[in-house]
Amino acid sequence: MASTRLEHMFEVTIEAGLEPGAGTRTVLDRAREARRAELAAAAELLVVAAEWADLHPVPRNGQPAGWGEVDLHGEGLVPLAGEGTPQVAEFAPVELAAHLGISHDAGRQLIGDALELRHRLPRLFDLALAGTVPAWRARQAAALTTRLTPGA
């Protein structure tokens, strides 16, 4: 089988194609290791998003980041995360999203989920960082709790 080189998005070169003598065990071990790395990277991304938010608090008289637009009809911004979480400067999610190559909405959601987990669901945040709960599942829970009151 011919080898295909994938090196556009990654700092490392990934060789596609079986090495001579590679069996099912080798392929399964590589798959398991790739999945472990993927889960660890997703958890690390939550930490990075929360740290990015810490570095970009809302300046005095500044506009916080949120969902929606302020317009003539009085619609306001919905915060990125639930009550009690820190507000983030307006353009912080946009800058992070650009660096990650994701949409602005995905950047807002990532930061919102990270803040929701760290401030309102700290045990779940710790479980995600430990790898006990996949980050994607923790983020689903965070998205469901954002509008709940702290006592709920």
Segments and roles (model prediction):
Residues M1-A152:
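Peripheral, non-cofactor segments flanking catalytic/redox cores
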